[in-house]
Amino acid sequence: MKARVSSENLDGAGLLVVANDTEYRNTMYGAYTNETVIPIASASKWLTAATMMTLVDEGKVSLDDPVSKFLPEFTGAIGNATIRQLLSHTSGIAQASCIWEEQQTLEQCVRTVAAQKPAYATGTKFSYGNTSFSVAGRVIEVVTGQSFEKAFESRIANPVGMIHTRFDGNYYPTESNPVPAASAESTLNDYGKFVQMIFNRGQLNGVQVLTEQSVLEMETDSVKGLNTNADAAVQTTGIPTYGLGTWRDVTTTDDVGVITSGNGAYGFYPWVDRSRNGYGIVFVFDQRGSDVAVPESQREMHWVWAALDNLGVPQTSTPTTTYGR
């Protein structure tokens, strides 16, 4: 990490590594501190999926509910796209530029999305993108009666203790049209608490933020039976299997997610490692493009795994398949 900061002239970076209840690294490099806020890009998706799962836990939403149940502007076949498909990039909803337009509201943008032709038949393809998460964010608004930002704050950020994490911060300053897939910013400490909560199967500091079943749903393969290899994001990450808002970097031979992650375009790379009983984050804001920044952070994560193995950190003996570049 230190070499990356120097060679790429980055402001800083950070590394968090926890395994078997031991914190092996919580180190900042360059000008970064544990409270430095950076954009986390698509690692936002993990947060949005978790926010939706709180509604599932309360019985207000089912993952198999059609989007039209909450947003009647979605008509025809696309109205049958389910909440599960919104969170797994299999809904068929076409990408829309309005998700980036600050002068719109999330409601206005999603109405525009609903009027578009589907990109493909619902459930027939994995197409990684951002727009379906805006639709999911709007569902959250309708069900809770709150803005997406407020719903995230009350349901995830506050109980987890993510005091510096926002979807409408300095890097994307709009509360009216946040991008649930990509506009969050966070700190190492904040997101570290989130992955700790996911690792603990929904619990943190005695608070059950998510049920264990919801965490399991997020880590379960949602694209089984689909050929994902042609997708650009799969080609970048080398990971062909996806859950709900999270990639499945390592799976067992019976398809249980062992290591899941939520990598972002600027190289921010958080993970939960059930094989070594831990979690971690490569904390970096690397603007060289996702095709460079993400694989480099992924390699650093793999180096962490190798270092833990060299230290003799116990690992599950279950046969696994590891994906990545």
Residue ranges: model-predicted function:
Residues 35-47, 59, 75-79, 98-105, ...:
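Extracytoplasmic/periplasmic, Sec-exported soluble proteins
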Residues 34, 39-43, 55-94, 115-118, ...:
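Active-site helix/loop module of the DD-peptidase/beta-lactamase fold
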Residues 46, 92-94, 133, 172, ...:
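Solvent-exposed loop/turn segments at secondary-structure junctions
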Residues 164-182, 188, 220-281:
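Active-site Gly/Thr loop motif
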Residues 15, 21, 38-64, 133-141, ...:
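Active-site SXXK
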Residues 227, 289-325:
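Short, gly/Ser/Thr-rich active-site loops of penicillin-recognizing serine hydrolases
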Residues 2-33, 100-101, 161-163, 270-273, ...:
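A short, well-structured edge-of-sheet supersecondary motif
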